[in-house]
């Protein structure tokens, strides 16, 4: 395996599946667990950050008359709901997990302690990070970048519904062209919006590569971790 310790970033919306008839689609969850299990069987150390957009996004707060900070905390709680669902599903598939949160929730998860998180990874446990970094005004992309740097992951894998980074939105423009590789500088200059600027800068300053790939295509996660081209590498 090219990457021995990874940080996998998943979006909350992806858990809804294509029908979006429920907050969490069982078939999607099952597929994700099967993909992750293939890495565990290969000895890859896995940390996961999952969004909460299928339940609540902090950005919705203003339209609902909710204070921005309060809305961000609501979004953090949404990520914990998704993290708990993923944890249960992974354990049902025979994997060992630990859920760590950026805010205190002693009854359901551990607080984030960097050295403890690294030790969990070394012992082969999947570590799921919930509740963002515990502060408002930060996205789950920023959480992914920060936690990846903190636990010394060798790559951030951003699982999306498209197979990489394109010159423009491939869902709107059929003539969009996919990049196989980009430097951080190129991605910045082209304003490709791979992550928010805080998250992107953290990766760039720490020379932490990002791979954007289609998480919904079977076998893609294993290919990416193996170093095969199955998305866009930003480094």
What are these regions (language model features)?
Residues 1-235:
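C-terminal catalytic "cap/lid" subdomain
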């Amino acid at each position: 395996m090219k990457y021995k310790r990874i940080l996998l970033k998943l979006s909350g919306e992806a858990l809804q599946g294509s029908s979006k008839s429920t907050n969490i689609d069982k078939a999607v969850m099952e597929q994700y667990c099967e993909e992750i299990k293939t890495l565990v069987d290969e000895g890859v150390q896995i940390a996961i950050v999952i969004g909460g957009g299928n339940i609540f996004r902090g950005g919705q707060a203003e339209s609902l008359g909710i204070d921005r900070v309060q809305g961000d905390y609501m979004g953090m709680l949404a990520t914990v709901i998704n993290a708990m669902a993923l944890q249960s599903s992974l354990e049902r598939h025979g994997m060992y997990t630990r859920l760590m949160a950026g805010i205190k929730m002693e009854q359901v998860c551990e607080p984030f302690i960097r050295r403890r998180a690294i030790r969990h990874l070394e012992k082969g446990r999947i570590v799921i990070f919930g509740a963002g970094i515990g502060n408002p005004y930060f996205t789950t992309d920023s959480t992914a970048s920060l936690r990846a740097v903190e636990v010394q992951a060798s790559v951030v894998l951003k699982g999306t519904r498209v197979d990489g980074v394109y010159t423009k939105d491939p869902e709107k423009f059929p003539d969009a062209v996919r990049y196989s590789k980009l430097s951080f500088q190129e991605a910045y200059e082209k304003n490709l919006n791979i992550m928010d600027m805080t998250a992107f800068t953290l990766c760039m300053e720490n020379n932490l590569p990002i791979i954007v790939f289609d998480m919904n295509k079977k076998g893609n996660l294993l290919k990416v971790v193996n170093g095969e081209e199955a998305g866009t590498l930003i480094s």
